[in-house]
Design a protein with these regions (language model features):
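Internal maturation/activation junctions in enzymes
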Residues: 5, 14, 23, 71-195, ...
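Extended C-terminal subregions enriched in glycine
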Residues: 105, 186, 232-233, 266, ...
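Accessory "access/gating" subregions that flank catalytic or transport cores
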Residues: 1-55, 169
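Short, well-ordered beta-strand elements
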Residues: 48-55, 61-66, 74, 180-181, ...
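Short Gly/Pro-enriched turn/cap motifs at secondary-structure boundaries
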Residues: 33-34, 40, 53-56, 169-173, ...
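Active-site rim segments in enzyme catalytic domains, especially the processed small/beta chain
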Residues: 11-26, 157-160, 164, 170-173, ...
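In a subset of proteins, long, contiguous C-terminal domains/tails are tracked
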Residues: 316-368
Length: 368
């Protein structure tokens, strides 16, 4: 398999620039790779421990956003209101800015600082009643290093089959990341987001019948960033499954396809269930939104300063109030955002539960 990949990547292929280039992955790279077991990064929010991947993924974004939001009044944590949606969006912008400045594989990521109460308080103090249109990473580990920011206006490519696989706003299926949650009667519980590539943007290796992964687009070619392309280093992916624990016992698993939106939609879910007391299915079905005011992880890696994508079910009054605060709102239709699924087990009664997203008919909850 490694030799077949080696032979294939040495063949020049046409790039979106119109020029032919060979790949850089070699059999020696694959031979040197070793899978690893890594401790989860955890933080407590309102009595629930939230466990995430390390900073080779974007998992700590969710933890950082929760740390910023935790001390606020419950009324400011309701994503269905203008006040709550504004506060959540602004917290996410700050957490995602730190992702761009500090997250990567194998480096000295200042996670302890980023997830600390003092740092969260300093970030919270940056939130005003107006929507920010700046990328504002904190000095968690010194002076932050960022790549050059680019807007969509700089790109007019008509190339298809590149960038992010997702469902169209209309619900049309064009492929997407996969996520799976499983729980059994004994309390074993798994959250997995195993996606790595997709056929429409990955060349297929004829000898193997499989496609190359495409996550390396999530590295930067500029030198000096936390996720600059380096040999032997994983890209800083968007894959970010979640486990929830209470009193040291696992109670739920959740996650979502959706690229940069994965932790954003999971944040809405956690606020609605932990703070709002909603059922899992109610929280999944509720109107969703996400910010685009940060560099995207998928080519061409642009950002929309102040951007906020909302489902129309947020309501005209809420949407107008968000626009009045300076958010650049894009309406995405009634049932277009969010791809969550979840399972759980009550550690006292042993009762299992599951819930899944109904949007685009791509999520299912099943038990036996």
């Amino acid at each position: 398999v490694a030799q077949a990949i080696d032979r294939f990547t040495q063949l020049p292929h046409r790039h979106s620039s119109g020029r032919d280039h060979a790949g850089v992955l070699r059999a020696t790279d694959l031979a040197a790779f070793r899978a690893s077991f890594e401790p989860a990064v955890t933080a407590s929010f309102r009595g629930t421990t939230v466990a995430k991947t390390g900073p080779w993924g974007q998992g700590p974004v969710l933890l950082a956003a929760l740390a910023i939001l935790e001390p606020l009044d419950d009324a400011l944590l309701d994503p269905s209101t203008a006040d709550g949606a504004h506060m959540v969006a602004e917290a996410l912008k700050l957490a995602l800015a730190d992702r761009e400045a500090w997250f990567g594989d194998g480096g000295a990521v200042p996670l302890e600082t980023i997830l600390s109460a003092d740092y969260a308080a300093s970030r919270r103090a940056l939130i005003s009643t107006r929507a920010s249109a700046e990328l504002r990473p904190g000095a968690a580990g010194g002076a932050p290093a960022l790549p050059r920011l680019r807007t969509a206006a700089e790109f007019s490519s008509g190339v298809t089959g590149v960038g992010e696989p997702t469902l169209e706003a209309t619900g049309d299926l064009r492929g997407d990341t996969c996520h799976l949650d499983v729980v059994d009667r004994w309390g074993n519980i798994v959250a997995a987001t195993p996606s790595g590539g997709w056929l429409q943007s990955s060349p297929t290796i004829p000898e193997l019948g499989i496609c190359l992964g495409t996550r390396l687009q999530m590295t930067w070619l500029e030198e000096g960033t936390a996720s600059t392309l380096r040999p032997g280093r994983r890209p800083r992916t968007t894959l970010t499954p979640t486990l929830l624990l209470r009193d040291g016992r696992a109670i739920a698993a959740l996650g979502s396809p959706g690229g940069d939106q994965q932790d954003q939609w999971q944040l809405l879910y956690l606020l609605r269930t932990i703070v709002g007391g909603w059922s899992p299915q109610q929280a999944i079905d509720a109107p969703a939104f996400h910010t685009t005011s940060f560099p995207g992880s998928f080519w061409p890696r642009t950002w929309e300063p102040g951007g906020l994508v909302v489902e129309d079910r947020m309501g005209d009054d809420v949407i107008r109030a968000l626009e009045a605060r300076g958010h650049v709102v894009t309406r995405a239709g009634d049932w277009s955002l969010g791809r969550l699924s979840t399972v759980g087990r009550d550690p006292v009664t042993g009762i299992l539960h599951a819930a899944a997203n109904a949007r685009a008919m791509q999520g299912y909850a099943a038990g036996r």
